[in-house]
Amino acid sequence: MKKIDKKEKAIVIIGSGAGGGTMAYELTKAGIPCVCLEAGPYLKPEDYTNDEWGAFGQMAWLDKRTTSGTWRVSKDFPGLPTWLVKAVGGTTTHWAGATPRFLEYEFKTKSTYGNVKDASLMDWPISLDDMKPYYTKAENAIGSTHRGGRAPLPANNNYKVFANGAKNVGYKFYATGPYGTNAEPYDGRPGSIQDGFNFQGDKNGSKWSTAKREIPRALETGLLDLRTNAHVVKITHDKNGNVDGVLYMDDANNLQRQEARVVVVSGNSIESPRLLLLSESNMYPDGLANSSGQVGRNYMRHMTCLLYTSPSPRDP
């Protein structure tokens, strides 16, 4: 693995997940050296555990948090904001693998829904047609099923029940995907054995993650300096306001500084804005890259809908 001097003004990538891991691979593939600072360890397939809570303790950000709000489902984890991974590969090592494209109307939410009370809807300045070539490129890298001629995942019994219900009420389009888990061998990864445990760390290696694809390939170029257990605390800038370095705590809890000419912030939806806000200064009192005042505001990371049924009436 390449070692880049801390005094060298390098391209520094913060985070090794979907954004950071992909950036590291694309840069090194093009012959450009870079440093990637990852807050967690480099877990290998044999390290993963087939237990959801065990995996949480192994992979998630367990740092103490301050949260606000009045309604929480979880009572035993009052400071838990969300399931984000602190390890090489980031949250690509813990995801269901669903890779749907936006629909056309989702790029135009304000035009579609109008002014919604207490919401901040906006139309994207791009369209589905603008994104199609990039969707295709990402799907080919991930190996999304149902795309590019790739086979769908086999239907399990749960899917068959829902598919039959959808058919009976008149739906015509339903499918097992697209997903980033191989139904057949693809791009050096095997087909899924559907063991039920590839959501939180995939021992079989059939699911795409940057820990499985992009980071190893970037390391193979000899141009990536991957520093694990490197927790970034601040991005610094010079007297002209240009970013010039990154401060981070190493695995021995020592404060280190990497000089930088470019910094890529890719720490997922919570850590990225948090870091930008923590990097405030006299020149940037509201944090870096925050001229709009919107960093950390009006953003929803993830929405999950769950439907439960019971064969017999139950008390409320």
State what each model feature region is:
Residues 11-35:
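N-terminal Rossmann-like FAD-binding beta1-loop-alpha1 element of flavoenzymes
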Residues 228-242:
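A conserved short coil-to-beta-strand element within the FAD-binding core of flavoproteins
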Residues 311-316:
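A short, hydrophobic C-terminal helix/tail in secreted or cell-surface proteins
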Residues 75-80, 85, 147-150, 170-180, ...:
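A short alpha-helix-loop-beta-strand transition element characteristic
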Residues 106, 111-232:
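Conserved redox-cofactor binding core of oxidoreductases
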Residues 55-151:
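Redox-cofactor-proximal catalytic regions of oxidoreductases
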Residues 1-7:
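A short, basic/flexible loop-to-alpha-helix module at the beginning of a structural domain
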Residues 29, 33, 40-51, 235, ...:
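Glycine-rich loop(s) and the adjacent beta-strand/alpha-helix scaffold that form part
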